[in-house]
Structure formats: C-alpha cells, structure tokens
Amino acid sequence: MSLRPDEVDVRILEENLLKTNTLVESMVASCQKISNSSYKAEITIEPISGMQRRMQVYETNLNNCLKVVDGIRDYAKVTAREEKIIRQGPEAVGLPAYVAAIQSVIRVNDEIEQRKLHSIPKVKEKAVDLARMGTSGLKENLATILKEESNPIDPVPILASGKPFPLMSPKNADKLNELMGIVARFSARQDNTYVDSRSRYLAMSLSPVASKVKPTVRTGKAPYDKQSNGIHIYAEALLKMLQAEHDNLRCAFPKDEARVKQYFTQLAQTPLQTYQAAGEEISNHVQRNISTDALLIFELIEGTVALKRGLEPLTNSAAPLDRLIQSSYNVSQGVFTEILKICEARVQQVMTLPSDNGVCDATVEVMSRIRRFAEYKDSAVLAISGMKYQQWIPQPRPAWMSTFSSAPAGYTTTKPQELLSAVFSDSIDAFYVTLEMKAKQLNPKKPSQVGFFLLTNLTLIERFVTKSEVYKVLGGQGRERLEKLRKRGLNLFLEGWKATASLLMDTTVVNSKGSLSSKDRELVKDKFKTFNADFEELVKNHKTYTITDPALKQLLAKEVAFICPLYHRYYDKHIGGDFSKNVDKYIKYDKAQFDRVLQELGD
C-alpha cells in the first residue's frame, strides 16, 4: 500500500523526535552522574579550603601582632629617648630640642589613642607624664625669666629723678614671646604665669606708696598742706608703672595686639581697684573732716584724672577710676559751700579790731586758704562743671549776701571757668562783707575808720590775689568784683569827708549890694568854724593811720582831694570878708595851704 508524501514526512519527523528524546535522556543521566561526582568532590575539598582560609587569617593576625610588637618597641624607644631630653630641661638641651621632645611624646600618645592600642597603657601613661613634665619645664623656665625681670622697685626715687621706669631686657622679652607661644600650644587653658608674676611685681612695688596715702585725723584747725598726703605720688607711680607694663607687653608680643590688650587689662585690674579703694577712703575722710581737709579732695581728683587720661590710649577698662572720680566730684560740691562758711565763720571769731586799724589775722588766714584752694584750679574746674550758678551758696541765705554782693545783677553762667571764678569771688565777698558788718558792730560811730580798715584788708586781699593762682581763677569779671568791694570800702572811708564837704554847700545869698544878711553872716561864720574843726580832725585821724602800702596811701589822698574844688569855690566867695571884719579868724587856709595839707596826706 502506497503512502502519501505528507504521511511520509510525519513518520520521519516522529522517528527523529524519538531519537532526540533518547539522546536527551542519555544526557540527563550523564549530567546526574557529573553532579554526583561534583558533590563528592566538594565534600572532599571543602575542609581543605577552609583550612587554607583560616591559615590566611592566622597569617594576617600574626603580621598585625608583629607590627604591634614592633610599634610598642618603637614607642618605648621614643619615650625612653625623649625622657632623657625632657628631664635635662630646656636650659641644658636648648629650647628647640626640648620642644621637639615634647612634641614627640605628644605624638606617641596621639597615635596610641588613634590606633586604640588599649593593651599598652603603661606606654601611653609614660607619654602623657612626659608631655606634662615637659610643659611644666617650659613654665618653670618662663617663671625663671619673669622672676629675673620682676624684682620689686621703689617708684618714688625714679619719679623724683625724672628717669623712665625700668623695662624688661629685649633678650628676655624675645624669650618670653617664644616661650609663651610654645606654652600656649601645649596647654589646653590659658597660662597665667606672665600675668601672675607681673601682678605680684606691681603689687609689691606699689605697696609702700599706697601705705602712705591713708588719711589721718590731724590735731588743730590748720588747713591741709598741699601734697602732704601722697595720693599724687601714688597716682603718678601707678600710671608710670602701668605704662611701662604696656611697653613690656608690646615688646614681648609685637605681633599679637589681642594678647597685649588682654594681658594689660588683666594686669591693670587689681592695681586700679586697690587705688580706687584708697581714694574712696580719702573721700570719706574729707567728708568727715571737711573743715580742715577740704582741699585734699581736689588733690585726689587731680591725681585720678591725670591717671585716667594717661591710661586712655592703653585701655578702655578703667571703670574703677570713673567711679572714684564721680564720687569725688560729689564730695567736692560740698567743699565749695564749706569754703564760704569758713570765710564767714572766721570773721565771727574776731572780737576786736587792730589798734592801728590795719590787717587782721582773719584776713591772712582766709586768704591763705583761698590761695591754697586756687592751686587746685584745674581739678576744681572739673568738679564744678556739673553745678548750677551759686548752687554753692549756704542755705539759709547768709546775712552777708543779704547785705551786699559784688556779683552783677541777674548774672548767671554754665561755663566751668566762670563758675569757679564766681565761687572765689563769693568767698571773698563772704569774708569782706562779714568783716564790714563786724567792724561796724565793734566801731559803730566811726565809718571812716571802718572804711580805712576794710581798704587796708582789701589791699592785702589783692596782694594775695595778684601773687597767686587766684588771679588766674578770678579772671576779668572777678577783678571787676574786687573793684566793687574797693568802692564800697571807699564810700565808708569818705563818709566823714563827705559830711564835712557838705558844709561847703553854700546856701547864702549875696544881695545886689554885694553883702550878706546878718543871718547869713552868722551862718558862714559857723560853717567855717565847724569845717575847720572837722577838717583838722579828719586830717589828724588820717595821719594816725598806719599805711604801709604806697598805692593805698596815694589812693586815699587822691580820693579825699575831691574836697579841694569845693573849698576853693567857698573860699573865693567869702574871702572878701563881707561876713566878718576879722576874716583870718574864720578862714584858716588859703587855697594853696589847703591843697598842701591834702597833698601831704599822700607823701
């Protein structure tokens, strides 16, 4: 039976598939055999591979251990080597080698920490100890240099000589600069060796000066003598020493302005606080003893202000001085008032006037105080700058001011110089007017003598003014106020002369025939008699005055000469003799004689 072509192809394909299946089965069986063989090989080989890996780990660990051992051996060698150097000290081995040794042991410690080699604590401890020992050695070396430069000094002879205060040697300054920089690198905290050493130097040098400013209560009522306390020396010594310290810092740290500023602030703090405490003690003392030690407060202000101004270019940390200056200003305001009270009170102690109507002791004492006061004019100007005009006038208003004041009516000012001038003028007013009131009380019926007494004392007052700093303090306006006092004294002195001169004010009338009435004749006679008696009494009294000052003598003679033209006129009117047949009995002086008598008063 014959097959179609398609069937033949199918049959061939089936046969081929059958062969393929048989081949695949054979391959699967072979792969299974290979797999079984591989499994057996793996089981056999795996122990060998694991052992190899463990051997590699062992090898690595062993190498690491050997490296550690080598490292430990190296660290121990380093610390042993550097220990010899560090123990010798920087002076023996030199600073570079010494610093290198410290850096080396610090590096050992750092590496041990970084590698976490906790199994070698002794090596680490040794490195730490050596680093600490090395740093201490540097500080000791630093302290040695500072000690060499910090022997206490006595500032007083240096101030007296005008020489500059001692500075560190440039060589040691360079060493300090280097050492301080190294110590700063090796120290976690700021090292205070420099500040501590120089602070002790300042304290020990200034201590003897500071001990001499302690105020003491003095016996008696004598006023304070300038510079007898010593605060001015203390202030000047402190300034000069701090300026020298700043120069030292600039020399030691020429490129480190921040450190200069920091160290100087620290160095200045304690000395300034100590000075402030001494100043506050003086200020309190003045308040308790203001009648005798009032001027000491201006000496304190003067020294403290100079100290502050001297330190301003170096530091802005002078708060203790600011506080002291302000408290001193507050005390000084009471001193201005006290000066006026002293001037008035001293006059109240006067019981009698001098027999020659001359200068009284009170004038000398008061003007001596005012002269001393003027010596502190600069500090007084500073202190008064915060006051109002005449705030210093005692309350209640004193009697002298209600009687007379030489101050211009309605005057006021806020300028410190003018305020101080007003204080001095008011002080002189207080004394002069109170002296006038006292003189009138003791000698009520003789105004001319009172006037002469006042003018004599004013002459001494002016002498004190012109020969002292008072002249500068008063200025032009103060001198104008003195002139008002002079005019007041002259008016008193001339009262008797003016009363006598009033007799020459003729009220008589000459009739058309050139003659006087009988009543007027008698009046002229009485006037001449009275005038002659009064005039001679005035001249007699004038000649009894002890006038040692030529200028005053000439001034008084000039002032009384106002009567000359009045006498001349009266003389010319009546010399014809109409009022009397015996003219010489009433007219004792012709015009030339009269003028000569007055001229002799000025010779």
Swiss-Prot record:
InterPro entries: Cullin_repeat-like_dom_sf, Exo70, Exo70_C. The keyword Hydrolase does not apply. Its main location: other. GO terms for molecular function: phosphatidylinositol-4,5-bisphosphate binding. Keywords: Exocytosis, Protein transport, Transport. It is found in: Bud; Bud neck. One of its GO terms (biological process) is exocytosis. Gene3D superfamilies: 1.10.357.60, 1.20.1310.30, 1.20.58.1150, Exocyst complex component Exo70. It comes from the Eukaryota. Pfam families: Exo70_C, Exo70_N. One of its GO terms (cellular component) is exocyst. Belongs to the EXO70 family. Involved in the secretory pathway as part of the exocyst complex which tethers secretory vesicles to the sites of exocytosis. Also plays a role in the assembly of the exocyst. This is Exocyst complex protein EXO70. The lineage of its organism: Eukaryota, Fungi, Dikarya, Ascomycota, Saccharomycotina. The gene is EXO70.
